[in-house]
Amino acid sequence: MAQEIELKFIVNHSAVEALRDHLNTLGGEHHDPVQLLNIYYETPDNWLRGHDMGLRIRGENGRYEMTMKVAGRVTGGLHQRPEYNVALSEPTLDLAQLPTEVWPNGELPADLASRVQPLFSTDFYREKWLVAVDGSQIEIALDQGEVKAGEFAEPICELELELLSGDTRAVLKLANQLVSQTGLRQGSLSKAARGYHLAQGNPAREIKPTTILHVAAKADVEQGLEAALELALAQWQYHEELWVRGNDAAKEQVLAAISLVRHTLMLFGGIVPRKASTHLRDLLTQCEATIASAVSAVTAVYSTETAMAKLALTEWLVSKAWQPFLDAKAQGKISDSFKRFADIHLSRHAAELKSVFCQPLGDRYRDQLPRLTRDIDSILLLAGYYDPVVAQAWLENWQGLHHAIATGQRIEIEHFRNEANNQEPFWLHSGKR
């Protein structure tokens, strides 16, 4: 088994030649493009996908390899997941050659081999550079081709930085150097994810407003912080993909996701000092300005401002860059129960909302939209330990007030303000349960 650690970027077609020229200056070992043919397999009931597993056969110059990728972690475009590779003499699956640890119950399901069938394919040329960064070995792969499922297809034009040996920080360091040039967009959608989508008939991707965050029952505050930022980054990347594919309404959700990053930093600000995220927040400001301007989606998402901000957030998360800024007291707090933290801060944010909206504000409602947005975001991040139906019903009145203010509906404003202020809390006031 190998632990695959790689960072993926989508490359703007117009930037390919400039990118190739830059990669040739890095002083690494260059490999000419080779054609890679891949067939991905699945069962009719999506058993593999349901277990977060991906199965493929890759062909290269008459050689074949079967690969099984299993559940891992994706932070931004940084993929960290185990993979199992088996050499084959011909392009035919042989699941019995995979180790038993691959399978959920420690053994190959009896009927799986007879149920898997080709689902989609990728056909692309891979050009590689092997470079050394601070003693770590990194493979840079430029892939160009297409992914295809039945009558549907879409182009592949992406860059992958894979850590062959050494430290993940070296991958991030190299990535920072590369994104200083325009044309790269950190992407979380793998070739396989795009293939699965095409195989489903290429349905339109829908806008997904942020929902309540759920974390493990025994999570500590640091795990809550990580989960909140990962949610914000996932929302950012998902809606950026929609925006660049032509859904103009997704732009608002991209900006909302960046705001969620800021609101997360504020929520945990009593533990993580502002100086820990100064550089990150500066890059977010530059990114927001670029996105909010009148430039096209393509220009905005492939800009250096967006690429650097998203990469900085990924690096901040992966390296836990807040830790060097924590004193002994903060170290104790961040190791405490996230459930207790959530109860305390739910009460604080609810009290703030009531203090602001306890009385009609006349023409001053719009002035309070930023505060209302921040409080709603914070409650979305904190409410996951409670009945989701009850918590969402509580939130909907405040979300309704937000929408009414944003759209100038005076009657609706007062309706939702009264409803929101008169509802009972769904959490424990004491912070204990």
Curated annotation (Swiss-Prot):
Knocked-out gene: effects: Cells lacking this gene do not show decrease of specific PPPase activity.
Signal peptide: none
Residue span(s) of domain CHAD: 218-433
CDD domains xref list: CYTH-like_Pase_CHAD
Reported pH dependence: Optimum pH is 8.5.
GO molecular function: inorganic triphosphate phosphatase activity; metal ion binding
InterPro entries (alphabetical): CHAD_dom (IPR007899), CYTH-like_dom_sf (IPR033469), CYTH_domain (IPR023577), YgiF (IPR039013)
Enzyme Commission identifier(s): 3.6.1.25
Boundaries of every CYTH domain copy: 2-202
Catalysis performed (reactions): triphosphate + H2O = phosphate + diphosphate
Keyword field: Hydrolase
Activity regulation comment: Inhibited by calcium ion and activated by magnesium ion.
Purpose of the protein: Involved in the hydrolysis of the beta-gamma-phosphoanhydride linkage of triphosphate-containing substrates (inorganic or nucleoside-linked). Catalyzes the hydrolysis of inorganic triphosphate (PPPi), which could be cytotoxic because of its high affinity for calcium ion, thereby interfering with calcium signaling. It also hydrolyzes slowly thiamine triphosphate (ThTP). YgiF is a specific PPPase, but it contributes only marginally to the total PPPase activity in E.coli, where the main enzyme responsible for hydrolysis of PPPi is inorganic pyrophosphatase (PPase).
Protein name according to UniProt: Inorganic triphosphatase
Organism: Escherichia coli (strain K12)
